């Protein structure tokens, strides 16, 4: 029986490259000259932004988004925390979401059932397995999921006949 997996993952190498490019851009920008501002990537899951003021942290957010888009990473996978300000400066944690959460997986399954396609969807941890009798049904399911607007980027993987 043909099947495929629906996943939501971020390429860690591309993420590292995007953060490095964002740091390089900080070094070359005129409005950040002589300023202690930087991006730090922790375990490929959290990006820490730090700068002397919260205004500069917001500018850094725009730089980070631009670099991620240039590297082909969907910014919907990012969850921006609150800007923490103290005497030493301002910081913001940006969490990189990996995998499909249970609640979102249920929404995906409901969307497939609502489309009345001849496919079955089952939740396997942080991914969703969709099976059907015909390849055309699976292609229709992919089209339905691509058309639907979810708050996370979806990739389709492991297509088997």
From Swiss-Prot:
Amino acids binding 3',3'-c-di-GMP 1: 33
Binding site for 3',3'-c-di-GMP 2: 133, 135-136, 161
GO CC term, one of those recorded: cytosol
Keyword Nucleotide-binding tagged: yes
Gene Ontology molecular function: nucleotide binding
Coiled coil start-end: none
Pfam families: DUF520 (PF04461)
UniProt-listed InterPro entries: DUF520, UPF0234-like_C, UPF0234_N, YajQ-like_sf
Highest taxon above the source species: Bacteria
Regulation: Activity is regulated by cyclic di-GMP. Cyclic di-GMP specifically binds to XC_3703, which inhibits the interaction of the XC_2801-XC_3703 complex with DNA and prevents the transcription of the target genes.
Gene ablation phenotype (knockout): The deletion mutant shows reduced virulence to plants and alteration in biofilm formation. Deletion of the gene also leads to alteration in levels of transcript of a number of genes associated with a large range of biological functions.
Key words of the record: Nucleotide-binding, Virulence
Family: Belongs to the YajQ family.
Role of this protein: Cyclic di-GMP effector that regulates bacterial virulence and biofilm formation. Binds bis-(3',5')-cyclic diguanylate (cyclic di-GMP or c-di-GMP), an important bacterial second messenger that controls a wide range of cellular processes. In the absence of cyclic di-GMP, XC_3703 positively affects the binding of the transcriptional regulator XC_2801 to its target genes and influences their transcription. The binding of cyclic di-GMP to XC_3703 inhibits the interaction of the XC_2801-XC_3703 complex with DNA, thus preventing the transcription of the target genes.
Entry remark concerning the domains of this protein: Consists of two domains (domain I and domain II) adopting the same topology, which is similar to that of the RNA-recognition motif (RRM). Domain I is composed of the first N-terminal beta-strand and residues 101 to the C-terminus, and domain II includes residues 11-100. Each domain contains a four-stranded antiparallel beta-sheet packed by two helices from one side.
Subunit structure: Interacts with the LysR-type transcriptional regulator XC_2801.
Protein name (Swiss-Prot/TrEMBL): Cyclic di-GMP-binding protein XC_3703
């Amino acid at each position: 029986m043909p099947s495929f997996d629906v996943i939501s993952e971020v390429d860690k190498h591309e993420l590292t490259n995007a953060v490095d490019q964002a740091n390089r851009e900080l070094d070359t920008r005129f409005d950040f000259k002589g300023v202690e501002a930087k991006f730090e990537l922790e375990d490929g899951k959290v990006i820490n932004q730090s700068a002397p003021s919260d205004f500069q942290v917001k500018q850094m957010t725009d730089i980070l988004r631009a670099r991620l888009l240039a590297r082909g990473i969907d910014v919907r996978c990012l969850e921006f925390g609150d800007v923490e300000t103290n005497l030493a400066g301002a910081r913001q944690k940006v969490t990189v979401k990996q995998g499909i959460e249970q609640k979102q997986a249920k929404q995906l399954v409901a969307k497939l059932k609502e489309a009345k396609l001849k496919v079955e969807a089952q939740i396997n941890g942080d991914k969703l397995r969709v099976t059907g009798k015909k390849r055309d049904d699976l292609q229709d399911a992919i089209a339905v999921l691509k058309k639907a607007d979810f708050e996370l980027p979806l990739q389709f993987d492991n297509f088997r006949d």
